[in-house]
Each structure stands twice: as C-alpha cells, then as structure tokens.
C-alpha cells in the first residue's frame, strides 16, 4: 500500500472514529422519509414523503397502502410497477431475484435497508427475495441523486438506489401491538409471520419480528423440444427460509435519536436445474446465512448543524454443493465479512441553502473453502467522501455533489486487484413552470465509478485481477405534473411523469448465468443506452367509501454494444435487456370486497451478447387478480386476502431455461391488535 495513501486513510478513519462517539446522541436513520427540523433562527420544513413530481431526479415511491390496493405479493412484484427496472428471477418462492435499472446491471443498483446500504462484496448483487413484503412500510427507487442530501456517501455511489423502509414503530402509545399473519398457497407454500412492538416509555420503543417460509415449488411447465411437447414438473426446488429482526429506537433528548437493529437470515434451498433437452435434473443445494447489527445516531448539534453516524458489522455465508457433479460432489463455500462506519455533517444556512459532507469507511474480506473457489483470500479498504450543496426556493431546486472513491485492494496470497480512485460529479435541478400549478421540468447528470467485485477479480477461472472498472454517465431530462384534489368524501387526482435518458458505460462487465449460483463475466467495453420512462397514477373518489385507482408505467430502453464498429456484435442489444416493458393496475375499494387486477410484461430478450440463433427468450405478459376485505372492532383488526397470480397461465422465462410458475393462488389471513 502506498505510504501517502495509507496516511490519508488512517487520518480519515481517526476522524470518523472521533465523530461517532461524539454522536452517541443521534437519530434513527431514515432515508426515504424527510423530517421536519426546527433550528434556532430558521425553520426548515420538509414533507413526510417527498412528492415524486417535485424531485430533481426520477423518484418512485410505493407505500404500505399501495401494496394492499395494487395486489402486491412480494418485493419483486412491487418492482414490476416501477418503470426502468429489469428483474432476473429463477422462479418460485425464494428463488434468487436481482434488480437492474435502465440497463446498468444489478451491480449498479444499491439497496438501502432502513437507511443503511446492504453489501455483497462477493458478487455485488443484492438478492431482494430475502426481504419480506410483510415487514415493509415503503419502497422507493431513486435514479440519480436523492433530494435528501443528509445521507451516507455510499448511498450516493450508485446510479440507482432502492430504499426499503420497514414498518415504523409506535411513537407514544404504551400498549403492546401484535401482528400475526399466515399465508398458504400453491406448490406447497406456507409462510407464518409475527411482529411485536411496544413503546416501553415515551422515549424508548422496541420491535421484534420473525418469518418462516416453506415451499416445494414443484410447479408444472410445458417442455418444447423441436416437435416434441411434454408436460413436466419442476423438481429439486424446495426451500426453507427464515428471518428475524430486533429493532430499538431511543430518544434520549428532544433533538437526538438512537436506533439499533439486529438481523438474521437463513435459507436452505435446493437449486433447480436448467431445462435442457429432455431434463431439468439438478443436484445443487445452497444454504445462505446472513447476520448483521447496525447502530444509527442522529443529533442536532447547534442551531444549524446536524450530525449523523452509522456503525455496522455484517457477516454472510454461502455453502454450495452439487451432488451430481462429474467426478464426485462439488463443494464450494464462501464467507464474507464487512465492518462499516459512516459520518455525515449537515449545515442548513437558511431556508434555501443546505450543505452536507459525508465520509464512509468499509473493510471487506472474502475466503472460500478451496483453491477452486476464490483465489488469494482477498480483502479491501474502501473510503468514500461526498460534498453536497442544495439550493431550494419556491420554484427552483438545484443539487450538486462531488463524490471521491478510493479502493485499496490486497490479498493474503497471490496477486491482488489494482487500487482505484476517482472523483465523480453529479448535478440535478427541478423547476416549477407555473406558480399555481404542480407542473415541473427536471434535468440531471451523474457520473459513477464501480470497482469490480471479488468474484470478478478473484473467482477461479472466471475472475481477473486486471479487470477494468466500470465508469458510467447518466443524463436525464423529464417533465412531471399533478392535478386535482382529494377530500375525505370525493375528489380526483392525476399524476404523470415522463423522462428521457441517455446512459453510457465504459468497460461494462456483463454477467451471463452459467447456472443459478455461478456467473461468467464478459467485458463488453462500451455500452450506450437510450430510453424513456412514463408513469401515470389516477385516483377517483366518487363518494365516501368508494375509490378507484388506475396506475400504469411504460419503459423503452435500447442498450447497445458500442465497443467495436467492426465487430458483428456492434449495436446489438445487451443480454437480458428488453426493449419494451410495461405495467398496469386497476383497483376498486368499496364497502364490500376490494378488488384489484394488475398486469406487466416485456418484449423478447437475448440471453447472450452474441444473439445466437434459436436462443432468444420470448416476451411475455402476466396478469394477477386480488380480492381483500378488512374487519375492525375496537383495537382488533382482521384482514383476509386472496391472490391469483399468472391468471391466464402463461408460461414464460425471465432467465433462459428457467421456467416461471403458471397460474397459482395465495391465501392470507392477518390479525392485528
């Protein structure tokens, strides 16, 4: 390690370590919701939920009520309602699900869980199937920079961030609150969920939740092999999954909040094989465990200064076995660890100007069970620093940020990946065209640098320590509007957003699945992505007790290989990127039984960058139907719900040779007190 770099790193670590104890009177972190701060001499009032039409960058928000009204059954299902998202899904409950946004790839999508970024130094991809919709209070996708500048530097280090906010704890109600739910469904699905929460005192609240999911996932599918058509059933796809959380929120003073979380996840599952020719045989098994603890503190230091601190330790294990491997059992296990800390200092000069400085440090390491897994026992020091300025008056909002990224790579054995550093600028603005109308134009630019993951650098046979990092540029121009008003008894509101974008990736690393656990990496070089996203949300309340909601979204993205004009792959669409995708939903709430119908679909995709003849994955469209009703008496509430997914039993694939389930049903009973 360079001596000058080492001194700078140690100095920054000392500064962060000094700030965190000083902030032992901090706030519970919350990146989706803006807060209201009363400062000496100035009052800064921000909305509880930032309106999507006012954001300087594309910002899509779904809250708990939206999940119920739109028939959302899991996090992946919710993301189908957001434009610009591409999901990779291996099918069935508990199947691995990853998210890419606007053609950038899943490694460029950050996932934030209750204000702290999740990490996976091995693959760089976050499996969103781990996070139960039953415990989620809100989902938000930010493409570019969020208008809330008081965030960790890591949260600004990706082109897009998916924020998951869990259910909020009670504030001053001293009574215990209990939620119990049971889900059963097709293909052996059974999933109980329980949550207990209570405000022990006016300043201390605790919550605990636990969930277990079992599924056979033995759904039928049709196998077509040239002229032969047979009815088959998915095999070797069983899963046992459980997760638990403990949460605490403590307010020692009027201006200080401390939050703590302990999290554990365990999934023991069989991995179904690729459907090839006449078989989908598989002997692969994977057990994944993840545990982390995090502490967040937030406090108002003086009239205009606020401080936030985060400390987190994360541990993850993946134990993979293939009992049908040629020559004997193939055993590949991995263990990764991360120590992470962050400090952010916010200065609110007045009602218009605000400035933030954030510094994050992380240490990651990874080791495998044998020399055939990860070579060299790599580790990495990461230092991220961001400086942000925001200006906001009645009609104009402007935001500028400069992010400094430093990655120091090493390995206990053998060669290591090179060290990397970069300055990444971003700027965005939103302007209200008419003072009396919610009509806005917005524009943004963001440059981001992504270091290769440990798999990309060190994986046996697939990784390379000489692999070039990815550099991305994204430009967005859009218009948003919202009209109408809503009262308790009647009203009509319409919200529309339209964004066009240009993205560029240099030295793009594209992952193509070799099987469900191992991916091969191909360095494409240059990629150009042109696209457009549109959303519409209409709410009509003709009279009390009746409401109709209509939602829709559409995405166009042309993600082209632009590396070499002489190559036969020049201008070809990148693997797994559909050119067109859409989603829609209609909900009718009434005094009897609420009903929702929804649908989504994509056009054809290629599973490889070479577009080999006969490998194209057909497009698909899927529809779902939901009926639900709630009954309340006193403090008690009982909810019943029936979901039918893939209503017309269409067979399709999101990942090549991994068929998705056909028509299925799910019954949920929930009790609250």
Identify the meaning behind each predicted range.
Residues 27-28, 217-221, 230-242, 249-340, ...:
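Flexible loop and strand-edge segments within Gram-negative outer membrane beta-barrel domains
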Residues 304-320, 363, 441-444, 470-530, ...:
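Membrane-embedded beta-barrel scaffold of Gram-negative outer-membrane proteins
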Residues 133-179:
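A beta-strand signature from Gram-negative outer-membrane beta-barrel systems
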Residues 76-117:
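Extracytoplasmic beta-strand/coil segments of soluble accessory domains associated
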Residues 395-398, 495-504, 523-608, 637:
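Gram-negative outer-membrane beta-barrel transporters
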Residues 38-68:
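N-terminal periplasmic "start-of-domain" segments of outer-membrane beta-barrel proteins
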Residues 550, 601-608, 616-618, 627-673:
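C-terminal beta-signal and adjacent terminal beta-strands/loops
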Residues 348-362, 367-503:
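Structural signature of Gram-negative outer-membrane beta-barrels, strongest in the C-terminal barrel
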